[in-house]
């Protein structure tokens, strides 16, 4: 598995580059837009952290300027129904620290700025991301604990935990309910969540 590359930029475009290593092998990498924009002109030297995706018919490489951004990419692709292209699109709009601040502030709506992510998907991604990033804090030093998501999702999670449900289970069912019906108010969403939890125990 390729985890790091150093070499000379041969070509670059909006979200990809070809890097020629000293061994004479040229690697094509997909990149977050800001990383691609910051690359030197062809002929310049670059070093990138790499995530490798092995498929039956292809070997895909995703490049990042920092180890934190690569680890955040790996966290994102661990979210259900979120593939590497969507993760790359998110990291084209937010750095690793930006995402930690989004989670810490409870601002799920911020994710809607990413092309291809609607309100329903943003709520689901936000809740799963909050759980996965628990205990991490941005470099600026926001509190390391991840709060319960804001808005309707946060109220549903709070209501379920007050009823004795474990927080991870509450976050998961809240995400499922609001993904299915993103316009529910708190009371209706809580009722749906309780129905799902009751059905799961049968």
UniProtKB/Swiss-Prot annotation:
Region of interest: Domain II: 66-144
Cited Gene3D superfamilies: 5' to 3' exonuclease, C-terminal subdomain, DNA helicase RuvA subunit, C-terminal domain, Nucleic acid-binding proteins
UniProt region (Domain I), positions on chain: 1-65
UniProt record, GO biological process: DNA recombination; DNA repair
Entry keyword set: Cytoplasm, DNA damage, DNA recombination, DNA repair, DNA-binding
An MF annotation (GO) of this entry: four-way junction DNA binding
Source organism, top-level taxon: Bacteria
Major subcellular site: cytoplasm
Gene Ontology cellular-component terms listed: cytoplasm; Holliday junction helicase complex; Holliday junction resolvase complex
Region ranges (Flexible linker): 145-155
InterPro entries: DNA_helicase_Holl-junc_RuvA_I, Hlx-hairpin-Hlx_DNA-bd_motif, NA-bd_OB-fold, RuvA, RuvA_2-like, RuvA_C, RuvA_C_sf
CDD domains (alphabetical): UBA_RuvA_C
Membership in a protein family: Belongs to the RuvA family.
Assembly notes: Homotetramer. Forms an RuvA(8)-RuvB(12)-Holliday junction (HJ) complex. HJ DNA is sandwiched between 2 RuvA tetramers; dsDNA enters through RuvA and exits via RuvB. An RuvB hexamer assembles on each DNA strand where it exits the tetramer. Each RuvB hexamer is contacted by two RuvA subunits (via domain III) on 2 adjacent RuvB subunits; this complex drives branch migration. In the full resolvosome a probable DNA-RuvA(4)-RuvB(12)-RuvC(2) complex forms which resolves the HJ.
Protein purpose: The RuvA-RuvB-RuvC complex processes Holliday junction (HJ) DNA during genetic recombination and DNA repair, while the RuvA-RuvB complex plays an important role in the rescue of blocked DNA replication forks via replication fork reversal (RFR). RuvA specifically binds to HJ cruciform DNA, conferring on it an open structure. The RuvB hexamer acts as an ATP-dependent pump, pulling dsDNA into and through the RuvAB complex. HJ branch migration allows RuvC to scan DNA until it finds its consensus sequence, where it cleaves and resolves the cruciform DNA.
Swiss-Prot/TrEMBL domain comment: Has three domains with a flexible linker between the domains II and III and assumes an 'L' shape. Domain III is highly mobile and contacts RuvB.
Protein known as: Holliday junction branch migration complex subunit RuvA
Organism of provenance: Solidesulfovibrio magneticus (strain ATCC 700980 / DSM 13731 / RS-1) (Desulfovibrio magneticus)
């Amino acid at each position: 598995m390729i985890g790091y590359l150093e070499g000379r930029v041969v070509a670059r475009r909006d979200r990809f580059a070809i890097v020629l290593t000293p061994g004479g092998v040229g690697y094509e990498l997909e990149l977050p837009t800001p990383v691609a924009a910051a690359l030197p002109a062809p002929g310049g030297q670059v070093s990138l952290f790499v995530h490798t995706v092995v498929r039956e018919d292809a070997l895909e490489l995703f490049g990042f300027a920092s180890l934190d951004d690569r680890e955040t990419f790996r966290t994102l692709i661990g979210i259900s129904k979120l593939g590497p292209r969507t993760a790359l699109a998110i990291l084209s709009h937010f750095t690793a620290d930006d995402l930690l601040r989004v989670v810490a502030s409870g601002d799920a709506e911020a994710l809607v700025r990413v092309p291809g992510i609607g309100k329903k998907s943003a709520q689901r991604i936000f809740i799963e991301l909050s759980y996965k990033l628990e205990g991490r804090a941005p470099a600026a030093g926001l509190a390391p604990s991840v709060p319960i998501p804001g808005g309707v999702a946060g109220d549903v999670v709070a209501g379920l935990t007050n009823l004795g449900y474990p927080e991870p289970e509450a976050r998961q069912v809240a995400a499922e309910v609001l993904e299915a019906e993103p316009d529910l108010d708190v009371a209706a969403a809580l009722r749906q969540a309780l129905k799902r939890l009751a059905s799961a125990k049968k």
